[in-house]
Amino acid sequence: MHPPKTPSGALHRKRKMAAWPFSRLWKVSDPILFQMTLIAALLPAVLGNCGPPPTLSFAAPMDITLTETRFKTGTTLKYTCLPGYVRSHSTQTLTCNSDGEWVYNTFCIYKRCRHPGELRNGQVEIKTDLSFGSQIEFSCSEGFFLIGSTTSRCEVQDRGVGWSHPLPQCEIVKCKPPPDIRNGRHSGEENFYAYGFSVTYSCDPRFSLLGHASISCTVENETIGVWRPSPPTCEKITCRKPDVSHGEMVSGFGPIYNYKDTIVFKCQKGFVLRGSSVIHCDADSKWNPSPPACEPNSCINLPDIPHASWETYPRPTKEDVYVVGTVLRYRCHPGYKPTTDEPTTVICQKNLRWTPYQGCEALCCPEPKLNNGEITQHRKSRPANHCVYFYGDEISFSCHETSRFSAICQGDGTWSPRTPSCGDICNFPPKIAHGHYKQSSSYSFFKEEIIYECDKGYILVGQAKLSCSYSHWSAPAPQCKALCRKPELVNGRLSVDKDQYVEPENVTIQCDSGYGVVGPQSITCSGNRTWYPEVPKCEWETPEGCEQVLTGKRLMQCLPNPEDVKMALEVYKLSLEIEQLELQRDSARQSTLDKEL
């Protein structure tokens, strides 16, 4: 089929291909006619005409019979606010503009409901605002329940807006009377109890209250009144008197202990408390916490050293307590000597035990060997040792069958006079430590005298002059004892105060008030002219219950002992009670006198 001819024009084939498919869609047989129809339909929009006005949520046309579907440019339609809205602009119109659109300013806004007011014992929660369509919620304070609606909405009412539900009420929650308990009672006497009300329970005599003495009316599930906590019980509870070895009761004396009775403990000297010093009788008839233990923190029970005695003054006993580091010196009894050359001391160690000691062994006198003589009599002390001759033994002997002599075994293992012999010649005199003697012969002594002298720094103890008689020296050799200077001590004093001390003198350190001994409290002048152990120091001690106010200053701030404060308060309370009784007595006397008059 050939395309039609167009008068006075030319046919563009490309445009035909574009128009022809639409003509088929709309069932138009002539493409030219289809194009003309399409232009006619689009022409009003191009020229600015508007379609139907939009539907507004806040307003409606004043002419409710409006039926037109096309409006010319410049057309103005008047509107009125819908219920729940109020006019906010003087112009309430929509206008069709040249673009074919309806234009307008928002001219109606939500109306607002009045504030519902305060809810007594409750709260009003405004979610957004009080405008038309908004919702508020009501709730009651704890212990109150709500009567009425929990919500209310701002809605249209008559010609305005109002709340859909009135303000509710909050009523207080009530509890039934509290439960009764055996062997006890409560303080309440009402039929009902308001939320928050409390009652107190008490037990009959000889019964103890277990649990909380007071319970209160509370709320459950926002409306139900319940008592909390659970009511107590009244039981008979007693605890046995606790036994704390090496401990002492500070308070809480009594043969019987009931529920919640309290005992306060302290430990004896030399022991430290492990556990709680305060315990109370618990509901299970047991002490809570468990009674404490007193563990030793010092050395006790002095070691028993056979054939020895202690040098410390005053002499220690088995009941004494010694801190770690304490040094005690022992001395062998006459007739005994130290087993070794080590110091005869014991020291309290950190493990609270005394250092091992060697002890003392028997010191025997030698058997006399007499030339031209014989032992005529022997008196023995018979101790339990291996010695043939021991301290205190006495022998009598004769020389040349004419002269008779006697000798006694001394504590140092020598005979007095010196080892018995028959003859006029004396042996060399004994040498002494830290000293010497003057002699007239280098071989033997016959009716001679010697004089002992001590080295510098030592003093002679015993007879300085000895003479030889019948082969014996007139006396045992003296000793040179060391001299120790007075210990230098700051903030303390010595039990014996002098310029020099003779071995083995012992002194005790006593610190001034507020100072404590750091080191051994007892020291001894030793053979090398020094003090053993070293001289301790007296250092400042912070009193118990006090604290240092200024660093580097001995300015302390102390709090009173709680037990002293408690005792003072009890005494003050007793004085007030006595004063009250005296006033009552005087008042009774005055009343009696008035009646007699």
Curated annotation (Swiss-Prot):
Organism encoding this protein: Homo sapiens (Human)
Claim: Disulfide bond is one of the keywords in the record: yes
One BP term from GO: complement activation, classical pathway
Domain Sushi: 49-110, 111-172, 173-236, 237-296, 297-362, 363-424, 425-482, 483-540
Assembly with partners or alone: Disulfide-linked complex of alpha and beta chains of 3 possible sorts: a 570 kDa complex of 7 alpha chains and 1 beta chain, a 530 kDa homoheptamer of alpha chains or a 500 kDa complex of 6 alpha chains and 1 beta chain. The central body of the alpha chain homomer supports tentacles, each with the binding site for C4b at the end.
Protein name: C4b-binding protein alpha chain
Superkingdom of origin organism: Eukaryota
Gene Ontology MF annotations: RNA binding
